[in-house]
A protein has these predicted regions:
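N-terminal active-site segment of His-dependent metallophosphoesterases
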Residues: 13-92
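Extended active-site neighborhood of metal-dependent phosphoesterases/phosphodiesterases
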Residues: 91-181, 224, 247-250, 274
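Active-site environment of divalent metal-dependent phosphoester hydrolases
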Residues: 24-28, 83-86, 112-120, 164-168, ...
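Active-site neighborhood of phospho(di)ester-bond hydrolases with catalytic His/Asp-centered motifs
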Residues: 19-21, 74-79, 106-112, 160, ...
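A short C-terminal boundary segment appended to hydrolase-like catalytic domains
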Residues: 277-311
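Short, low-complexity, charge-dense intrinsically disordered segments
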Residues: 1, 5-12
Length: 311
């Protein structure tokens, strides 16, 4: 069914949203030692011993080049651009973002690695603010998150699940205020007849308390009211797919693998997704495609993600 829908999407005028995550694109070589006198020292040692070989800028460049060939209308990055969220990393990520696209083309939500500890936002995440803010005329009011960006028939709603955590924890939390604003945005965009894509870093489905979204239940309750057409995330570094049963609603959820992974593990092969959305008189026609790097052939292989995204 999904393959059939994808064929239809190609034949019709559609909105193409690309989705990648967890590029971990930065180097820790410029990080100053005084920035490591906290939880970051553990992440730094992990990077020195293992993680710097788990992610490749060369693979990330190949992923972006292949993605560009799909000519998406918009790119969503669901967090973890950095390793430790240090100031030098955030500057490096800012330079990378400016090179690959303008803020009106790219939407970001932060990941747990981007907010590893509490830090001066102007020196860290604030550098990406242009990629994480609502349209000037959007219905969003109040804090930075959730933001609302409307592209064609699609409402892109970005949440921040990135909060500082204790050592050895990579969990996330949205908080009551953010969820209240989310409910208002979902209602407003439903009234506008938009296809609502909600993005966050952490999976809204069950994970361990050490890595999961602590208020996933509250998110589910929020979605049960006004609903959403699609929820997307990163964090897992592997292809993930589920369905949220939000009251009477069934909402598809897709988790994309890391865009730069070099684990030599087929289950964690790098790649990205494309979501194609078309507005019909009878409702929505939509499909999701995966593009995953085959480590043997070194080619990106296209697949259709299961599940019916039409409404």
């Amino acid at each position: 069914m999904c393959l059939f829908l994808c064929v239809l999407c190609v034949l019709c005028g559609v909105m193409k949203i690309a989705h990648l995550s967890d590029p971990h694109l930065t180097s820790l070589d410029p990080v100053r030692w005084r920035e490591l006198l906290n939880k970051r020292i553990l992440g730094y040692l992990s990077w020195r011993l293992r993680r710097r070989r788990a992610h490749s800028r060369e693979i990330l460049s190949r992923t972006l080049a292949h993605l560009a060939g799909q000519q998406p209308d918009h790119l969503v990055i669901s967090g973890d651009l950095t390793h430790l969220g240090a100031a030098s990393e955030c500057r490096e990520a800012e330079t990378w973002l400016n090179r690959i696209g303008a803020p009106d083309y790219i939407s970001i939500v932060p990941g747990n690695h981007d907010r590893y500890i509490a830090a001066d936002p102007e020196q860290t995440l604030g550098r990406w603010r242009a990629y994480m803010q609502s349209d000037p005329d959007a219905a969003a009011r109040g804090p930075q998150f959730p933001y609302l960006r409307v592209r064609g028939p699609v409402a892109l709603i970005g949440l921040s699940s990135a909060v500082p955590t204790p050592p050895f924890y990579a969990s996330g939390r949205l908080g009551e205020e953010q969820l209240q604003h989310l409910s208002h945005l979902l209602e407003a965009t439903a009234q506008q007849g938009l296809y609502r894509i909600v993005t966050l870093h952490h999976s809204p489905h069950s994970m361990s308390s050490r890595r999961g979204l602590s208020d996933a239940g509250a998110l589910l309750s929020t979605l049960a009211g006004p609903g959403a057409e699609l929820v997307i995330h990163g964090h897992g570094h592997r292809q993930m797919q589920a369905t949220l049963q939000a009251g009477a609603r069934r909402i598809p959820v897709f988790g994309v693998p890391s865009a730069s992974a070099s684990y030599n593990d087929p289950a964690k092969a790098p790649g990205y997704y494309i979501y194609e959305v078309n507005k019909l008189p009878s409702g929505w026609q939509a499909c999701a495609k995966s593009f995953i790097l085959n480590e043997e052939t070194q080619e990106f292989e296209q697949g259709s993600l299961g599940g019916d995204l039409t409404t």
